Amino acid sequence: NFAINAKPKKEDLGTRHYTATATTPLSKADVKAFINTLDGLNNFQSDDNTIIQFISFNGLMSYWDEKNGIDKNVSYLKTMVNPCQTIARKIKWAGKRNEFQKIIGTQSFGLDDWAYTCDKTLKAYRATNLGTAEITSLNILKKGYAYKMINQYGYYTPEERQTHKYFIEAVIQTFQSNANDQEAVRPYKHELSKKLSVFGANILGTPLILP
């Protein structure tokens, strides 16, 4: 490795998963490929009419979910936990799948596996940026202490207690990431910070929670 004129070894980025699901482990290759789609995603949402259309889907999706038996709070919190799966759903509703595929296809993504890779990358990115106090707070939530407090005191109606429980679970899941995924994301934290900052608080009208 230290010999004169020795060629640097190519970094092992791991296996590139081309048909990712919600349970497929992240690799550095997956994270790098996702990052390479972010400039195209930013260009995709640069048109004002596109933004307006996708924002309008927020209410329509909540209405549709509620009509199909999904609690409106759950519908919104699913968007908070998995924003990229919500974006994929909006793209399908808007009939823009082929247009979006031109962006993510450059990295050999399909729409659904791009969404899964995106959501797992964001969760791992959030998790790797947690401080000690935030980790402690999450552990308190995971152990159910907040649930017990909500049930113990009679300040809330049953509906309000259920809403609080949904929210607590959503907070936990927003930062839920395993060690493998976090290690895949860690080398790209700076690049992710730079690329994601251009979106601000949302992507295509979908809330984006960043560290």
Regions found by a protein language model. Give the residues of each.
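Long, compositionally biased
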Residues: 131-209
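Mature extracellular/secreted ectodomains of secretory-pathway proteins
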Residues: 72-158
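Immediate post-signal-peptide N-terminus of mature secreted/exported proteins
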Residues: 2-72, 173-177, 181-183, 187-190, ...
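A near-ubiquitous, low-amplitude feature marking generic local secondary-structure context
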Residues: 13-17, 21-24, 83, 87, ...
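Non-membrane alpha-helical secondary structure
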Residues: 23-26, 30-33, 56, 69-79, ...
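Residue-identity detector for glutamine
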Residues: 45, 53, 85, 99-101, ...
